[in-house]
Amino acid sequence: MKRFLLTLAALIAAVDLSAQVSIDNYPLPQHPDTLRILAVGNSFSDDGTEYLPGLLEAAGVRNVIVARLYIGGCTLERHCREYADGTADYIYYKSTKNEWVTVSRNATLLDGLKDEPWDIITIQQASDDSGLYDTNEQGIPKLVSIIRKEAPNPRAAIVWHMTWAYATNSDHRAFPRYGNDQLRMYDAIRSCVDRARKQFNLPVVIPSGEAVQIARGTRLNNNGKVPPTSKVYELTRDGYHLTRQHGRYIAACTWFETLIKPTLGKSVLGNSYLLLDTEHSITAKDARLCQKCAVKAVKAYR
């Protein structure tokens, strides 16, 4: 009985502590000489940032350094384990001249964190757990404490990347957690974002998931044009990763509008980048619609 009461008391204390946890956070910088952005994430941060250098170049913005630390499917908790173990499991990409370069395929979390005095560091949960708040509640303060300890700039803004719900036909192993229901997953992600913003002092959110969901209600969605057995469905290329055309473009526009407009004063609206340097070019009309979806999403999360 005594052991039970001690265990119960410890659990209550842990719950009470998590309820009180907040993080020290700072605003986005205003018109810095060089803006430095690091994404600590997984394949969904890859999807979100892949076309950001192209948008920056088209906007005439050449004073932004963007980098991403990538492990496929990496959770908040795993980032913390990677740090504790000092393992070199990350691929580290960096853009200093609006073009991605692979810096290392065997990087540690510290390699990325200490590479630059980052102004903005983005974090996110793995898509599997993106709508399960207990995983965010445990992982966010742990990872942020590591960032605060190791990042050269003690006033870096910590920004949350909101990811997207799977396509309705997705066969992702985690989709049953959400009843194989896209709207249920989307609502769960939104709820997690809202709670995390309040609990952990995360005012700035990159709402890629919101922008993608908005776009799914437009002609950009292909769910009425291809059979539901198609892998390329509802702006995904496999049921969960974004298509290399409109999907990734929408997400990059969302990153741009969230981070570049408030810091450097340039909106993504009217950006002329049409992916002509890739195999996935889009029309100016479609680009404009993607940009509008991104802007609408960002306004909803201001």
Protein language model features and the residues they cover:
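N-terminal secretory targeting modules
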Residues: 2-68, 270-302
